[in-house]
């Protein structure tokens, strides 16, 4: 092939252009080298995604990005994580404030909960950062569609998540669409095919594998540890995770059966969880009550949560039906040590919170969501 033809092919490749800062200012010296590299890249990009694993420092990177870009910025975070941002900002000398609505804005940088975004005039912000942006993965959801539409003209956009596509690689399309890189439909048409007549089963085309990941690398950076960018992993290697399995025997037959059988389908697993609540709660309560250390107890059913709260005297319970004020107060109280035990569901309190003071947790059974298990 001639040089001219190679140049022609290069121009035909799909690479999203940078739209951010032509030159990046000096960054906070408290950032680790891998964090500084990622922030500089995201500032040059303008619309970028930081898909960094848990513990890599997405919070400081998001705040530094927000601080160094030139516009008013709003950061959206899960419940109680917003207040965590404020505490972290103080450590890094970043002027950031929490607000519940438009009237509460006092700084150039504002952090709020996802649930409260509709209380703001979003067109006044020139920058937005989504913490735990995997919230966008449910493309058919009205909220995801609203988010994409609300920020489609915002010049600086940042997505951050350790699990951007926990179920299927095609979920990356909603992140790309939010950032204005490419719509989900365009991504599927260009890089994906579906098997047979089931259009929900998409996979990357064999010949498009390299092109797809090259395109991804033009707008997203993905790392699991600093050495992925050539830096030392010192301080980022977590201690080994010790998992202890406690088996609860169930002898009573499930509904519709003459005797107890192994749960195979989703419906059978759900029935087994409901039928064994009492035994599982009792086993967990014995374990937690015999300890004097901070403890996180994860459950999936409201009945489990209520039974656990009754069986563990010094626990605070966080349910989905609670007010936002109660949820925030309970989670912050657990973080501050006012409560030794917190009982909640991974989908409520399992995303984004830094709970390093608590080394012990119990799962009163597991759901079918790997993302919830990994994040919590």
Q: Residue locations for each model-derived region?
A:
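Conserved pre-motif I regulatory segment
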Residues: 9-51
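Walker A/P-loop
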Residues: 45-65
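Conserved Walker A/P-loop ATP-binding site and its immediately adjacent core
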Residues: 59-64, 70-92, 166-171, 300-302
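Conserved P-loop NTPase motor "coupling/switch" region that bridges the ATPase
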Residues: 70-73, 91, 127, 135, ...
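Conserved helix-turn-beta segment of the N-terminal RecA-like "Helicase ATP-binding" lobe
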Residues: 80-103, 179-182
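Conserved interdomain hinge at the start of the Helicase C-terminal
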Residues: 268, 272-300
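Conserved helicase ATPase core of P-loop NTP-dependent helicases/translocases
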Residues: 296-298, 306-309, 313-349, 372
């Amino acid at each position: 092939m001639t040089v001219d033809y190679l140049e022609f092919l290069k121009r035909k490749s799909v690479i999203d252009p940078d739209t951010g800062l032509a030159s990046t200012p000096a960054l906070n010296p408290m950032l680790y080298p891998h964090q500084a590299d990622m922030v500089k890249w995201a500032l040059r990009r303008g619309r970028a995604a930081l898909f960094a694993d848990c513990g890599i420092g997405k919070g400081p990177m998001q705040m530094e990005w927000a601080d160094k870009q030139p516009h008013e910025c709003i950061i959206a975070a899960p419940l109680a994580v917003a207040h965590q941002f404020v505490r972290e900002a103080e450590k890094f000398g970043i002027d950031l404030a929490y607000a519940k609505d438009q009237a509460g804005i006092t700084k150039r940088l504002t952090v709020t909960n996802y649930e409260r975004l509709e209380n703001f005039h979003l067109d006044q912000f020139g920058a937005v950062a989504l913490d735990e942006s995997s919230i966008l993965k449910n493309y058919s959801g009205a909220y995801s569609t609203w988010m994409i539409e609300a920020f489609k003209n915002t010049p600086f956009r940042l997505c951050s998540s350790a699990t951007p596509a926990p179920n299927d690689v095609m979920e990356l399309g909603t992140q790309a669409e939010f950032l204005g890189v490419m719509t989900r439909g365009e991504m599927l048409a260009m890089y994906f095919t579906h098997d047979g007549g089931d259009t929900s089963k998409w996979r990357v085309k064999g010949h498009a594998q390299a092109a797809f990941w090259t395109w991804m690398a033009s707008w997203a950076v993905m790392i699991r540890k600093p050495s992925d960018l050539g830096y030392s992993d010192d301080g980022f290697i977590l201690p080994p995770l010790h998992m202890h399995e406690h088996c609860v025997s169930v002898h009573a037959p499930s509904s519709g059966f003459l005797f107890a059988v192994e749960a195979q389908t989703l419906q059978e697993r759900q029935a087994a969880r409901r039928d064994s609540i009492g035994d599982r709660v009792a086993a967990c309560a014995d374990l937690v009550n015999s300890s004097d250390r901070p403890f996180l107890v994860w459950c999936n059913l409201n009945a489990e949560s209520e039974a656990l709260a009754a069986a563990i005297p010094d626990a605070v319970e966080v349910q989905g039906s609670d007010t936002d004020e109660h949820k925030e107060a309970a989670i912050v109280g657990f973080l501050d040590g006012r409560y030794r035990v917190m009982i909640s569901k991974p989908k409520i309190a399992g995303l984004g919170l830094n709970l390093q003071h608590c080394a012990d947790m119990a799962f009163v059974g597991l759901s079918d969501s790997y993302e919830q298990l990994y994040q919590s």
